[in-house]
Amino acid sequence: MTRQGNWYVGFAVLMGASITVAAHRPVTAQAPAPASGVVTFARDVLPILQKHCQSCHRPGQIGPMSLLDYSSTRPWAQSIKTKVRSREMPPWDADPAYGHFTNDRSLSRQEIDTLTAWADGGAALGNPSDAPAPITWPSGGWLVEPEVIVDLPEYQVPASGTIEWENIAIRSPFKSDTWVSSIEILPSDPSTVHHMCFEFKTPQPNIVYNQYEWAEVPRDADGAASRRQGAGDNWVLTRDAGSTEVKRRPGRPTLFPMPKHCYVPGMSLHDYRPYEAGLLVPGGADIHINLHYQTSGKPAVDRMRLGFTLAKQTPRKKLVQLVPTGTTASFAIPPNESNYAAPVVEVRIRRDAELVWMSPHMHFRGKDMTWTLTRPDGRQQVVLSVPRYRYAWQLLYQTRVPVPAGSKFTFVAHYDNSAANRDNPNPNVWVRPGNQAWEEMMVPFTWLVVDTEVNDRDVTSPYTRGDGA
C-alpha cells in the first residue's frame, strides 16, 4: 500500500476496483466488531481485505503487493495502518455529503479501527479456522471469464523519451451483429500503460491494419506542444506492429478512435449486466485503438488482450457515454495560479435516462471537479463532488440516479499550478491543453443508461461552455 514514485501504482486500486469489482467480487461477510482481546488476521482483518483490497492486491494485478493471505500481508501491517488512518487507502475522493455510490470503497470507522488495532497488537494470525473462504478469481488475471478473446500486437516500450498517443486498427472477430454484455481490457504489464481506448468502426478504405500511426508533435524545452502554423507542416509517423522502423510522411493520421471503451491501470472491466444492458457490435466492424504508453527508465514489453462476454438475449438497455470537455483553445493556466477555473461545461439531456458512472479526468494540476444535475422543474442536485482530486487516484464513481428528459448537467473544475501542489512538475510555466500528463485536460466522463431503441445522437443537445467558475 505504499505510494510509489510512478503515478500508475497509485492509479491502481481506482477505477476497475471501483467500477467493476463491486459488481463482480464474490460476496464476503462483513467484518464483525472485534471480540474482546486480540484482533486477528483470520477472524477480523481478512474479511476487510477481501471486501476492499484484494481485487487489485493479488498476483498479476496492479497492486504492488499481494494481500491474499497472512504471510503476504503481515509485513505490511504498519503501512496498512498508516494508509487507512490517513484515508489514502483504499482511494476514495468523493465528498460524502453528496451522492450515493454503489462501489464506495471507503472504509468505515470500525474497519479502520480494526486494522489499526491489528497492527498495534502484534498483527496476530489467530485461528485459521476463523478465516472466510478465499475468493475464487478467474484464471489469467481476468475479473470475468471471457467468452471471446482478442490479442493485440506486442508493444515495445522504450526506457526513456516522450511517447505520443498512437493509433492502430485490427480486425474484429465478430462477423455478424453481436450483443456483448461486458468488455475487459487486460495488459500484460500494467505499469507501462497510461491508457488504452478503442471503438468498433465500419471498415474504411485506405486503412492499414496492424500499423501504429501517430501525429508528430513538436515540443518546446518544457515539453509543451508547439502549434503548427499550416496544414503543410503536419507529419505522421508510422511503424508496423513488431517492427522498430519508423517512417515519416506528410499529412494527418487516418485513424481517430473515440474513447468509447477504455483501460487505465485499475479500470479494466466495463460491465453492462447490472443494468440489463449491452453493447451492439456491428458484424464485420474493425477495432480502432488509441494507445498511450509511458516510460519508466527501463525498457518493457506489453501485450494487451480484449475479453468479451456475450449477451444471452437482446438487452433492454444500453450505455451512452458523454465526453464533454472544458479544455478549449482559451484554456490556459498561469504560472503559480492556485485556483484556475476551467470553462464551465453544460450538457442538456433530451431523453429519459439513468446516470450510472462518472469519472473526472485531469492531469497533474487537477484540483477539484463537480457534477450538478438540474432537473426540468429546476431542482438541483450535486451528484458528485471531488474536492481533492488526485491524479494518482482517478476514480470511477458508480451510482443510479434517474435523469428525466429536459435535465441538464453542469461540470465545474479547478486547477492548482502552484508549488503547494505536490504533483506539480513545474509551477513556473503556463499550462495549456494537451495529451501528456504535464499538459492538462478537463473531461468529466459520464455514462447514462437508455433504452436500446434510443439513437445515441438523440440523448444530448450539443455541449455548451461558459466562463470559468
Identify the role of each PLM range.
Residues 1-5:
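N-terminal secretory signal peptides that target proteins for export/translocation
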Residues 13-16, 46, 97, 106, ...:
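Short linear sequence elements within intrinsically disordered, low-complexity coil regions
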